[in-house]
């Protein structure tokens, strides 16, 4: 594992310049200078990202490297959340990852929308872990999936006596010290992507916005709702497709950081136009195809990025 460093400003050079300035004025200034304050400034950026400095991580958000699919695991103190469960391949990657994290129970499981690249291994998750709450967005009957992966998930839920709680915008609840807001879907649309659950999770002063595969029509619904979208970290919608992450939407979210769950395939995602939009707002963009699994640690104020590659 390694930590990414921000490159906007050379804080080492700042320390050197202050030293030189102190010598020029008076050597005694070195003794009286507040070095603790300077060092603290040198390791923490304006957006709260900590560079190679340990923090008391009350919350860790894991964006799994699952190719052009989605799976996010969150642990916050003694609470555990799973958002989506990748595609069918590579087999068992989600369950095995959760087992390595010593997960026994999931307090919340979220299906952003029932496309195969989001629910591919959900049946295995349901079979292998105790689940307290399972939520999804209701979709119109005319676009309800009929393919095997979705039907298998429903059968597995039934076998384990688990019920789906269907949610829409406006629902707010807490799991431990995490505040969760469902921002979408608001209206029904004629494609599964724009019926995705859009969810904001806040821990202390740090917030994460998860958008599933929400496209521009759903983004506009959420903008028009007047909800506060501003978030520290954005999980970029639809793997960086040009139909998502509209400029209007990003201007409301104003993310300091973006994470794109994507793999190498002929779709050539993320699209350049989306990266250009994101660069207008983000200090850094992280991609699972470049960095592998990405883990964000936070104490509710500062954040630290850990990457697999």
PLM features: residue spans?
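Non-globular, low-confidence helical/coil segments that flank catalytic cores
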Residues: 2-309
């Amino acid at each position: 594992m390694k930590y990414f460093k921000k490159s906007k400003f050379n804080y080492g050079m700042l320390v050197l310049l202050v030293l030189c300035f102190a010598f020029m004025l008076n050597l005694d200034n070195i003794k009286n200078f507040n070095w603790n304050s300077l060092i603290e400034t040198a390791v923490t950026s304006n957006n709260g990202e900590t560079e190679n400095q340990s923090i008391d991580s009350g919350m860790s958000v894991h964006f799994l490297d699952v190719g052009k699919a989605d799976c996010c695991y969150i642990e916050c103190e003694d609470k555990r959340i799973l958002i989506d469960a990748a595609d069918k391949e590579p087999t068992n990657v989600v369950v095995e990852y959760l087992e390595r994290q010593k997960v026994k129970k999931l307090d919340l499981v979220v299906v952003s929308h029932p496309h195969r690249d989001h629910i591919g291994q959900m049946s295995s998750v349901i079979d292998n872990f105790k689940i307290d709450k399972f939520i999804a967005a209701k979709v119109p009957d005319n676009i309800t999936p009929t393919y095997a992966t979705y039907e298998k998930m429903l059968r597995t839920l039934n076998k384990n006596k688990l019920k789906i709680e269907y949610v829409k915008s406006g629902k707010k609840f807490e799991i431990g010290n995490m505040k969760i807001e469902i921002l979408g879907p608001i209206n029904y649309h004629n494609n599964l992507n724009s019926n995705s659950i859009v969810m904001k999770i806040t821990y202390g002063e740090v917030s994460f916005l998860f958008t599933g595969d929400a496209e521009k029509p759903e983004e506009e619904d959420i903008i028009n709702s007047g909800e506060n979208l501003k978030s520290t970290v954005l999980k970029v919608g639809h793997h960086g497709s040009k139909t998502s992450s509209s400029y209007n939407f990003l201007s409301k979210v104003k993310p300091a950081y973006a994470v794109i769950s994507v793999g190498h395939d002929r779709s050539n995602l993320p699209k350049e136009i989306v990266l250009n939009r994101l660069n207008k707002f983000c200090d850094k963009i992280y991609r699972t195809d470049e960095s592998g699994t990405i883990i964000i640690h936070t104490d509710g104020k500062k954040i630290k990025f850990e990457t697999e590659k």
